[in-house]
Every structure is written in C-alpha cells, then in structure tokens.
Amino acid sequence: MQQRRPVRRALLSVSDKAGIIEFAQALSARGVELLSTGGTARLLAEKGLPVTEVSDYTGFPEMMDGRVKTLHPKVHGGILGRRGQDDAIMEQHHIAPIDMVVVNLYPFAETVAREGCSLEDAVENIDIGGPTMVRSAAKNHKDVAIVVKSSDYDAIIKEMDANEGSLTLDTRFDLAIKAFEHTAAYDSMIANYFGSMVPAYHGESKEAAGRFPRTLNLNFIKKQDMRYGENSHQQAAFYIEENVKEASVATAQQVQGKALSYNNIADTDAALECVKEFNEPACVIVKHANPCGVAVSTSILDAYDRAYKTDPTSAFGGIIAFNRELDAETAQAIISRQFVEVIIAPSASEEALKITAAKQNVRVLTCGQWGERVPGLDFKRVNGGLLVQDRDLGMVSEAELRVVSKRQPTEQELRDALFCWKVAKFVKSNAIVYAKENMTIGIGAGQMSRVYSAKIAGIKAADEGLEVKGSAMASDAFFPFRDGIDAAAAVGVSCVIQPGGSIRDDEVIAAADEHGIAMIFTDMRHFRH
C-alpha cells in the first residue's frame, strides 16, 4: 500500500544523539520544519539548524526540571490529529500537524545497571513524555511517521528522496511496529526493576532484595526464521536479546556457509560457552549439545588434534569451537579429516576462509574476543511456566579445593583435575569426564546412573586406545555410592574431583583411599539438564 504522506514538520527529542545532527540536517535541507526540546534543540541550534523549541511553539514553558515539556494539546493534537477528519478542530485551536516524530527514551537500563544506582536515580530516568509521543505517533501511523531507531535514519531519507519528500504507509506501519516494540521493552525494564525492588522498599534484607521480580517481562528480537525446529515437523525461529555485552552465538557473524539450523545454534552455543572456560589455546567439539572432545595446548591446531582423538566417531558432523583465531593450518586439518557442521572462533584469517570455502556446507562464525563473563539469567520452559535461575558462572580456584583423601594429588593430576572439572560443567548430567595431560580421554554423559556414566567414559577411552592409567576424573555432582570410584579405579584413574556432599561421603572417600586415588572436593555442583 502506497498512501504517501509528505513530511513537512518533524519533532525531534532524543536521549541517544547518535546520528541526529546529520538526520536533522537532511530533513531541514528537504524543507522540513524542525521542532525540538531541551538538549536536542540546543544541539541542533549550535549546529546552525533552524529549530523551534517546543515551549515556544506551545507557549508553555518546560517545567519541573524537564518533567513536563511535551505533554501539551498542541503537541499531541498535532501528532494524533487525523488528516482530513480533524483539520477544522486543529485549525480552530492553532494546532499544526506534526508529520514525523523522532524520539528515543531516557536511558533507564543503563542507569539501573550502574553500581550504586538509587531508587531516586532510577525514577528520574523514567521517561514520560517520550513514550507518550511514541505511542501517539504509532497509533496515528496512517498519517505520522514515528522513528525510534537511529539505524533507520538513512533509509528514511532515501525513501523521501524517492517519493518527493513523502513516506509510504508500508514504511509508516513498519516504523509503528518498531515503536510499540520499543515502548513495550522500555516498560518491561521498568516493571522488572521495580518488581525486584519490592523487598528492599519494604525494609527486608539485602538478600531478599535480590529475589526475582514478581512479574517477569522478556523482550527478544527475531533474528531469523528457520526451515524447522529440533525436528522437521516443528516450526522455529531464533530470537536474540538487545545489547548483548558478551561474545555469543547470538551476536556472532556468519561469514560462510548456508543458514544455521535450530540444532546448529543450540550446539554452537554449547561449544562456545565451554571453550570460554579456558585461557590457553583450546578446542571444544560438541555433538548433540554435549562435548565429545576438549583439549588445550600451545596452539589451536594441536588442541584440535587432541580434542578430535577423544572420540572421532562422535566428532563427525559436530560443532567445533576455538578461543583463538582460526588459522589456515587448523582449517586445513579440519577439512581434510572430518565433516563439520559449524566452526566458531573469535576471528578467522582470510587464508582459513579460503580453505573452508571449498566445503560449501561448512558454516563459519566469528564472534569476537570475549572478556569477563557477564552475569545474566537462564531460562527453561516447562508446560505452563518458566524456570528462571542465575547463569552458572560458578568457578573454583586451586586455593578453594579440598583434598579429602589420604594421598595428595600430584601437580599433573591437579592440572588434569581442574581441566576436566571445567569440561564437566558443560556435559549433561549425570556427567563424568576422564582427562589426561590437558585433553579429554573419555566422556560419559546424560546417564540416569552416575556409575554408568563412569563406565561409558572408560569404554570410550578404551575404544580409542587412549591410556586411562594416571588420569583424572571429574563428576558434576557427588557420588551417592562408592561404585563410581570402583569403576574409575578399575580402568586406572588416579585422581577424582567432585563436589562432595553425599551422606555417604565417608564411604566414597574410603573407596578412594582403598584404591590409592587422590580425591578433591570442590563444594560446588554443576548439574546440567
């Protein structure tokens, strides 16, 4: 639908000033009259643009430290007035039509994220006039264009140039959708913040103040539709958060290959989050959301070679993640050796991409380098509800470990124990990981009985001819019985790292002592379901 509307008058009032000067200049150059408020008006005037302050237009000053400035009939009448229907009443009250509203809102999220933010600080960053104008303009999108994203500025000017200064109804409708999404997300942030403040407001403890809000509002943006979901009879799409601050599969750039599938994204996330645990050059290979091979070394080439050796059969059609740039030598080793669905790394060299391009089905993602892990929430959907918890960023240092066995671990055993403990965090429970010399040699995942996970890890190692004697074993949760220790001892494990906490800890420790195994408690569990 065309239904073009010329843009003759625009109201600009933005907190985020990025691109606003250039946009205002472009509008003014095309004969658009500019109205503006406060800091935005001053900025435009400083740049020599002809701009009318809203207070001059309404004849009513800004007041109450800027709390009241655009809440006026001459503003909202100009936005909400229906062209061809309300013209007479607008003329009677000297209300000029406003054809475009350019608004983004007070930075509430940034304010409450700052350390030491008080309730008073948060309250003063709740925008009132801005959302009201946004909603008014979006409601009247038949006649008015509402612009809430600076990323739309260039496209709007191009369309105006192509349509003699007008915008089509299709464009105004699309802009209105973005506007309602913008205000919905904004109000959700405010509701979540105030909901989380209820205990503190009523004088409860700091611990109580950290509880989750009583109503949880979530906003995600669709990044892509998918051919199907986890199975071909399920429809699916991928939604992402705005302003993600950590390198992730959601922010990664696909530089090569066909579109990612639902399972590709889930598995790539598992691989990337695991490889982030390591500071040394590391490789993680994932299949069906479980690591099937992990290693660290002096180079990603050697790390890949060692990770692959853990379980070459499962690595076929897997996802490979690195924590260093993908180089040509490593890319060649992968392509020559196996079929791979996705490779993700902080970056990829041009030479590496030329090599992987020879395999059209290989998807290559670059996610940028990451720094500190960012706390957040994890969600698990259940029928009729949503489980919410803090993201599992729990880590233990060497100083926090407790040796509970008679024998102390050797330095190598301790290194291997810490290594496989990091891996176990990303293996589906019940999780058992065998590791030796900074590589996994057997992984038992997802078994209902912990002892069977231990047995499977041993079988995996034997199948690949990997030496288990002198290796470390990690368990994501405590051993309820000694049978898991007996199974590990039978294949030559010499060191066990586990959370501890079973009512039979004494029995389990005694089994370790009986077999001459060093046992370490972390006092931290890493269930993963």
UniProtKB/Swiss-Prot annotation:
Q: Which reaction does it catalyse?
A: (6R)-10-formyltetrahydrofolate + 5-amino-1-(5-phospho-beta-D-ribosyl)imidazole-4-carboxamide = 5-formamido-1-(5-phospho-D-ribosyl)imidazole-4-carboxamide + (6S)-5,6,7,8-tetrahydrofolate; IMP + H2O = 5-formamido-1-(5-phospho-D-ribosyl)imidazole-4-carboxamide
Organism whose genome encodes this protein: Salmonella paratyphi B (strain ATCC BAA-1250 / SPB7)
Q: Which InterPro entries match?
A: AICAR_Tfase_dup_dom_sf, Cytidine_deaminase-like, MGS-like_dom, MGS-like_dom_sf, PurH-like
Query: What are this entry's molecular-function GO terms?
Result: IMP cyclohydrolase activity; phosphoribosylaminoimidazolecarboxamide formyltransferase activity
Q: Which NCBIfam families match?
A: PRK00881.1 (NF002049), purH (TIGR00355)
Look up the record and give one Gene Ontology term from the biological process aspect: 'de novo' IMP biosynthetic process
Q: Does the keyword Lipoprotein apply?
A: no
The protein's name: Bifunctional purine biosynthesis protein PurH
- List, for all copies, the residue spans of the domain called MGS-like: 1-148
**Protein's UniProt keywords contain Cell inner membrane:** no
* Cellular component GO terms held in the UniProt record: cytosol
Q: Which domain of life is it from?
A: Bacteria
Keywords annotated in UniProt? Hydrolase, Multifunctional enzyme, Purine biosynthesis, Transferase
**What pathway does the annotation place this protein in?**
Purine metabolism; IMP biosynthesis via de novo pathway; 5-formamido-1-(5-phospho-D-ribosyl)imidazole-4-carboxamide from 5-amino-1-(5-phospho-D-ribosyl)imidazole-4-carboxamide (10-formyl THF route): step 1/1; Purine metabolism; IMP biosynthesis via de novo pathway; IMP from 5-formamido-1-(5-phospho-D-ribosyl)imidazole-4-carboxamide: step 1/1
Q: Which Pfam families match?
A: AICARFT_IMPCHas, MGS
Q: What is its EC number?
A: 2.1.2.3, 3.5.4.10
Q: How does the record comment on the protein's domains?
A: The IMP cyclohydrolase activity resides in the N-terminal region.
Instruction: Please give the family membership noted in the entry.
Output: Belongs to the PurH family.
